[in-house]
């Protein structure tokens, strides 16, 4: 129904909309803040700005009948200008939950304030223990690995990277490990992102998609080796701002605190990065084998979500334990062994250096880099392994001088020549020169 002059809103004069007045009244009715062009309410980031556009349309549709899309776009841009705010603080002393705020000292409040992340789960200290969830985990993981998962999921509730770890859950398939991601989605809502760890490293726009996210889940990890690892390593241990790029927007600096949780049938490996730094950032848990003849419950997720308040308390318990341990995760001997296995399988130089019959570590010995590499290639031939470069073998020894009690030198004498090599190692049965 057409409005009459008597019913026109204050911001409309019959021909034009007073944008300043409209935006003031709109923000009084729908309080928001705009940070770097993105709108936030007390419930966190508004992922779909179409919702705001629809609210604007409802306000103006009684006044205007044409050119609505352009007017809505202009008013939305004006609202963002009037709602400007500097970046919201990253708060690690509290968790913003659906029914208020949980403080890390154990207290809580029903008050809500503007925040980067508001979880979609309520804090209910009287929620019962999540029995079905605990049963599910006992069927999925070894008992000694469950505390690790509990601490990591709790770690994902706070916007911090002090733990400096990413978690991999590795199985043969069909165990149900990806159910964990669905449960976390029910707790974190839009503060969780689902994408590929490969994309994070290779797509320059993908890092911006992780801004203001607590968790990124890769529920079917690509087994191909990463061509680079520098972005992933930087994000896992992020302590300062890094460069963000969005399509059509000038790059800017922002701090990421997203954590990585990956499910797959094998470990994350890299084509060229065999450094300890790459593997040190990972925790690898292996699942139990799927029992033969097990009938999967198609309603399992629904049953787990009915316990989400209890699961949240369970995660909080893990978070408090992690903080009490100075952000050092509880890692079982089996998980440590998993990591060593991954390191050896992705870097056969380690296996060669630990082998017998090719080299020997002796304090009063020396060997040229060439002789060591020839011993390594013989080991590769004998073990059907693809050899890495000579530089990679020398680098592995040089980076682990203390571990192997060797010392790099350019003073190894071979056939009257002085060449590069190592003190403290000898080649067993070297081929004649």
Predicted features by range, described:
Residues 1-30, 40, 45-48, 125-139, ...:
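Replication-associated primase and helicase/ATPase modules
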Residues 1-122, 388:
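Intein modules and their embedded homing endonuclease domains
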Residues 12-21, 185-190, 225-242, 394-395:
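A short, contiguous, amphipathic alpha-helix enriched in charged residues
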Residues 27-52, 96-214, 283-285, 312-315, ...:
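P-loop NTPase catalytic core of nucleic-acid-dependent motor ATPases
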Residues 188-190, 195-204, 226-229, 243-251, ...:
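Positively charged interface segments
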Residues 206-249:
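Conserved nucleotide-sensing/catalytic segment adjacent to the nucleotide-binding pocket
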Residues 212-215, 256-260:
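Loop/turn-to-beta-strand initiation segments
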Residues 305-348:
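Phosphate-handling catalytic cores of nucleic-acid transaction enzymes
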């Amino acid at each position: 129904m057409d409005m009459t002059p008597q019913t026109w809103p204050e911001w409309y004069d019959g021909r034009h909309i007073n944008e300043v007045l409209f935006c003031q009244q709109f923000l009084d009715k729908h309080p928001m803040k705009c940070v770097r062009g993105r709108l936030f309410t007390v419930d966190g980031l508004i992922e779909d700005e179409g919702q705001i556009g629809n609210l604007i349309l409802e306000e103006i549709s009684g006044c205007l009948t044409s050119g609505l899309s352009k007017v809505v776009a202009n008013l939305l841009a004006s609202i963002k200008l009037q709602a400007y705010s500097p970046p919201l603080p990253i708060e690690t002393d509290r968790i913003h939950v659906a029914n208020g705020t949980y403080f890390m000292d154990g207290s809580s409040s029903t008050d809500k304030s503007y925040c980067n992340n508001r979880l979609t789960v309520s804090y209910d200290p009287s929620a019962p223990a999540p029995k079905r969830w605990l049963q599910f985990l006992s069927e999925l993981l070894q008992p000694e690995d469950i505390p690790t998962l509990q601490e990591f999921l709790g770690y994902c509730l706070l916007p911090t990277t002090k733990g400096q770890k990413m978690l991999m859950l590795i199985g043969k398939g069909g165990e149900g490990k990806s159910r964990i991601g669905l449960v976390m989605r029910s707790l974190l809502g839009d503060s969780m992102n689902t994408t590929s760890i490969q994309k994070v490293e290779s797509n320059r726009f993908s890092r911006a998609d992780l801004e203001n996210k607590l968790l990124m889940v890769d529920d079917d990890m690509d087994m191909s080796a990463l061509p680079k690892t520098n972005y992933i390593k930087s994000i896992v241990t992020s302590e300062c701002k890094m460069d963000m790029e969005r399509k059509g927007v000038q790059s800017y600096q922002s701090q990421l605190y997203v954590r990585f949780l990956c499910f797959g049938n094998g470990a994350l490996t890299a084509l060229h990065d065999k450094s300890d730094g790459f593997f040190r950032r990972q925790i690898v848990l292996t699942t139990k084998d799927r029992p033969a003849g097990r009938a999967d419950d198609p309603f399992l997720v629904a049953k787990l979500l009915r316990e989400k308040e209890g699961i949240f308390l369970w995660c909080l318990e893990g978070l408090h334990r992690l903080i009490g341990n100075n952000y050092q995760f509880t890692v079982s001997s089996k998980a440590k062994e998993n990591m060593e296995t991954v390191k050896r399988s992705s870097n056969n130089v380690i296996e060669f250096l630990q082998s017998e019959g090719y080299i020997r570590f002796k304090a009063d010995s020396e060997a040229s880099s060439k002789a060591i590499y020839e011993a390594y290639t013989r080991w590769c031939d004998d073990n059907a392994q693809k050899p890495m470069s000579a530089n990679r073998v020398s680098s592995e020894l040089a980076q682990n001088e203390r571990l192997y009690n060797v010392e790099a030198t350019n003073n190894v004498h071979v056939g009257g020549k002085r060449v590069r090599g190592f003190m403290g190692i000898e080649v067993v049965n070297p081929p004649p020169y």
